[in-house]
């Protein structure tokens, strides 16, 4: 899937699903190494957090893009871009396709995690196990995004939303909006602690509108996603990215939203079940391992 994809367009438990591309030019090239053809359907080529260096795709790979957006076609740095109706274009491809060799085997799903470490991966696993049928995930937890595809896969259309540009603070108010647009469905807002602080006042709107949103705060004590950028700036770590002593439950209660804090694996399931069953907004602050 394209980097920073804002919705789910492929079932993530399908045997041919191989995850999302990172929003990093060098990592994209490494991930796509060995590909004869890169086929991009309805997505840009490609979106990055920062521009990066070197080629955009492996040197021995061909690229074909099908898009209904002429602007996306003009921005594509390599390959052939075709502006077309996607339904008609994909239909024509399927009618003409005849693979000449067997695709390589794909890695299997990771094993189930035990209840011994409260990591973001364990949290995602338990959300996947306990989420109500038909629920919608609105995500702004960038440092946990790659783990989501293994431990919290999206299986249905209209079940996942996030910000395509990586904008800061989008997730919390977006979850309120999705709940208003999809009445009767459970909305789960998966938010990093840093992301949530950009728009924490959205909890007041959730309380006033009485929307059934479960706000899950992945509290790792800082802007962990930014730490990955440090090498690009010639630094070991970035200053000003730690967020100690935040009390999200107190912030929630001050705005009329019930809050519960989870610090141990054994507390997690009960907190999630309570929040998923509530008819009003609930915030669950999960204090995960800093480097888990």
What is the predicted function of each stretch?
Residues 1-64, 155-184, 198-201, 232, ...:
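Glycine-rich, anion-gripping cofactor-binding loops and their flanking helix/strand elements
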Residues 6-11, 46-47, 70-74, 90, ...:
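Short gly/pro/ser/thr-enriched loop/turn and capping motifs at secondary-structure boundaries
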Residues 12, 105-179, 184, 234:
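Active-site diphosphate/adenylate-binding microenvironment
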Residues 20, 34, 99, 230-271:
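Conserved thiamine diphosphate
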Residues 59-145, 265-278, 282-292:
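Phosphate/pyrophosphate-binding active-site segments
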Residues 84-90, 201-219:
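A short alpha/beta connector and helix-capping loop motif
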Residues 185-205, 218:
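DG-centered beta-turn motif at the end of beta-strands
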């Amino acid at each position: 899937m394209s980097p920073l994809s804002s919705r789910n367009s492929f079932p993530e438990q399908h045997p041919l699903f191989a995850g999302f591309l990172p929003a990093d030019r060098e990592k994209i090239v490494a991930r796509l190494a060995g590909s004869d053809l890169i086929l991009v359907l309805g997505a840009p080529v490609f979106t990055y957090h920062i521009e990066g260096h070197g080629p955009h795709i492996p040197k021995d790979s061909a690229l074909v893009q099908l898009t209904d957006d002429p602007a996306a076609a003009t921005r594509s740095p390599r390959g052939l871009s075709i502006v077309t109706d996607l339904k008609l274009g994909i239909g024509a491809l399927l009618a003409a396709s005849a693979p000449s060799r067997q695709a390589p085997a794909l890695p299997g799903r990771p094993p189930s995690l035990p209840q011994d470490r409260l990591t973001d991966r364990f949290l995602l696993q338990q959300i996947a196990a306990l989420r109500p049928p038909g629920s919608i995930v609105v995500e702004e937890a960038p440092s946990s995004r790659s783990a989501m595809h293994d431990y919290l896969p999206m299986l249905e259309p209209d079940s996942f939303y996030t910000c395509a540009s990586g904008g800061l603070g989008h997730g919390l108010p977006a979850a309120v909006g999705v709940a208003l647009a999809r009445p009767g469905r459970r909305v789960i807002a998966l938010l990093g602690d840093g992301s949530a602080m950009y728009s924490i006042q959205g909890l007041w709107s959730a309380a006033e509108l009485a929307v059934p949103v479960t706000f899950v705060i992945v509290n790792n004590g800082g802007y962990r996603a930014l730490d990955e950028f440090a090498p690009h700036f010639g630094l070991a770590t970035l200053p000003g990215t730690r967020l100690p002593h935040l009390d999200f439950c107190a912030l929630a209660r001050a705005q009329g939203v019930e809050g519960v804090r989870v610090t141990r694996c054994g507390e997690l399931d009960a907190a999630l079940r309570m929040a998923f069953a509530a008819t009003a907004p609930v915030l669950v602050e999960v204090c995960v391992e800093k480097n888990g």
